[in-house]
């Protein structure tokens, strides 16, 4: 737990129940968690919060995870931050699209908390 105390994760999901579930799970593992309720919110917070990793739901109303990822990767201030798609969309074409956008990992919903934590640790260089 001590190793992860400084790992800051920004989580974006439009479902408040899933957002809280992720926040609690990651908090129990010692991560510092910030939340965003949608695509515009995550883009606005990413530059302020300076997270080590960003988790993005793909299917959010308004600015989708796809669009948010593209905008985050196009911005010099946030382009270096590893992105993880967290989505029920598991088709290979979705995973390929994520790779093309520069997304570092794709975790399927319903997610396994152990897999999610391991992915974040790996991307934050704390594996």
Spell out what each predicted region is.
Residues 20-28:
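Charged docking surfaces used in two-component/phosphorelay signaling
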Residues 30-37, 45:
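Short hydrophobic/Thr-rich beta-strand motif most characteristic of the beta2 strand and flanking loop
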Residues 49-55:
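Active-site beta3 strand of CheY-like receiver
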Residues 57, 87:
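Active-site residues of response regulator receiver
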Residues 60:
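Receiver (REC) domain active-site loop signature in two-component systems and cognate sites
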Residues 104:
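Short, glycine/charged-rich "phosphate-handling" switch motifs in NTP-dependent
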Residues 111-121:
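C-terminal output helix
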């Amino acid at each position: 737990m001590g190793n992860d105390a400084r790992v800051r994760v920004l989580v974006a999901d439009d479902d408040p129940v899933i957002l809280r579930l992720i926040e609690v799970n990651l908090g129990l593992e010692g991560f510092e968690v910030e939340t965003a309720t949608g695509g515009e919110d995550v883009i606005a917070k990413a530059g302020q919060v300076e997270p080590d990793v960003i988790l993005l739901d793909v299917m959010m109303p308004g600015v989708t995870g796809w669009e948010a990822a593209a905008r985050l990767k196009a911005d010099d201030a946030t382009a270096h931050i590893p992105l993880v798609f967290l989505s029920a969309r598991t088709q290979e074409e979705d995973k390929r699209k994520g790779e093309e956008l520069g997304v570092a990992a794709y975790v399927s919903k319903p997610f396994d908390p152990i897999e999610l934590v391991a992915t974040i640790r790996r991307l934050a260089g704390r594996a």
